[in-house]
Amino acid sequence: METFANGMTLDVTVDALAPGGKAVCRHEGRVIFVDRGLPGQQLHVRLTTVRKRFAEAECLAVVTHTADECDPFCPHFGDCGGCTWQNLPYPAQLAWKERFVRDSLQRIGRIEAPNVLPTLPSPLQQGFRNKMEFAFTTDDREMLHLGLRRRGGHEVVDVTSCGLQTATTCRVVTTARDIARASGLPGWDDAAHRGFWRFLVVREPARGGQCLVQCITAPHPEAEHVARAFFTALRQAVPEVTGCVHSIRSQNSQVAYGDATVFTEGEIVLTEKLGAIELDFGHDTFLQTNTRATELLYGEVERMAGLSGREHVWDLYCGVGSIALWLAEHAATICGMEATPASVEAAQRNAQAAGCTHCDFVAGDVRALLRSRSKGKAQEPIPDVVVTDPPRAGMHPDVIDALLQTAPARIVYVSCDPATMARDVGLLMQRYTLHEARPVDLFPHTPHVETVVLLSNKEVDDTISTTV
């Protein structure tokens, strides 16, 4: 067997795709994960990491293409790290996402034959994002850039167009880049931890017509003055910009989130229509980025919850209350729990505007909130159904323990990561039965997938049926 070493180059054939999108190849019986590639392609690769049981590699060239490929629609594809599957036909993307969910439940959750339904496609495959995050940087020639991260690195690609965002967002980015360059202040330098311009976040409801722009900069004596001039020029050039937020970020980590808000201008609360409900949201609240596909996702949550109007529901990690309000007309009471105070305030406003007086939202760490409820310290009834939509890391073991102790009849688990979902579902299987899992594609042209899972309490009802 050939000895692997970092820097070695090989020709390999892609056998499959791994969750996260890496290409799975084999060479003399050893597995190699390559940063890009499609099944059937022959790649020329360079090994970057060698482990005992596998190796990682970067693709230097595609030696042989496959007949199953399609032409990417974006001029930045292959350079920008935003979406990696534009050359994979959409039906194949859906099939691989279903496989990722099934494989995760089998391999991580140790569920022998999980009932995984076909992936629901996104109604839109282009122009679907209601939020985009862009990064500033300055190169060695002192040229400022604003765009998306280059694949596998910290450099920024000046995107001139993007198939995932709207035409309005494209105009905002192009204009903002020109204004920032004219300021003479540098973009952020990751290595040196210095610079002024850091991030631009654009949020635009699906119905269009207005957008909210957040500019995040480093602290600077003239930061507010520069930012006000920036927004004045931006709003003159792009009238759809109806609200502006200037935030500062002192931390070095590359996260598009401000430590503090310096000032706001205009309308800083937007409204998104989701099915029959309307949701207010701002720059610091979470909302799914694909509105039309989110309606399909929530439709699956509603179907699996199987509410008749008599049930008490807990909505964990509820955000701005979107799932709670979607289910409100079918539930007796709903209690939403969320760690971010701004999101809870938005959820309360949304519920009040919708006339949902039976919906309550509580701010606090979900672990602590569940702990107090499991000890009988809260006034809410014991839930019949729990909907949980945790962050990518999944649920803390304490949350899982609290759910096992509370033992609702049904748990509907909404996940953005098949691996952590499968881990959590596997732990819940000691008291629950997995009825079905439904992947939903909120992120076309990427390997990311949302999943809705239905679990039923073995001691309460082991014969649940749902209509697909």
Swiss-Prot record:
Keywords: 4Fe-4S, Iron, Iron-sulfur, Metal-binding, Methyltransferase, S-adenosyl-L-methionine, Transferase. Pfam families: TRAM, tRNA_U5-meth_tr. [4Fe-4S] cluster binds at residues 74, 80, 83, 162. The keyword Disulfide bond does not apply. Its EC number is 2.1.1.-. Residues 3-61 form the TRAM domain. S-adenosyl-L-methionine binds at residues 288, 317, 338, 389. The active site is at 416 (nucleophile). InterPro entries: MeTrfase_TrmA_AS, MeTrfase_TrmA_CS, NA-bd_OB-fold, SAM-dependent_MTases_sf, TRAM_dom, U5_MeTrfase_fam. GO terms for molecular function: 4 iron, 4 sulfur cluster binding; metal ion binding; RNA methyltransferase activity; S-adenosylmethionine-dependent methyltransferase activity. It comes from the Bacteria. CDD domains: AdoMet_MTases. SUPFAM superfamilies: Nucleic acid-binding proteins, S-adenosyl-L-methionine-dependent methyltransferases. One of its GO terms (biological process) is RNA processing. Belongs to the class I-like SAM-binding methyltransferase superfamily. RNA M5U methyltransferase family. PANTHER family: RNA M5U METHYLTRANSFERASE, TRNA (URACIL(54)-C(5))-METHYLTRANSFERASE. This is Uncharacterized RNA methyltransferase DVU_0924. It comes from Nitratidesulfovibrio vulgaris (strain ATCC 29579 / DSM 644 / CCUG 34227 / NCIMB 8303 / VKM B-1760 / Hildenborough).
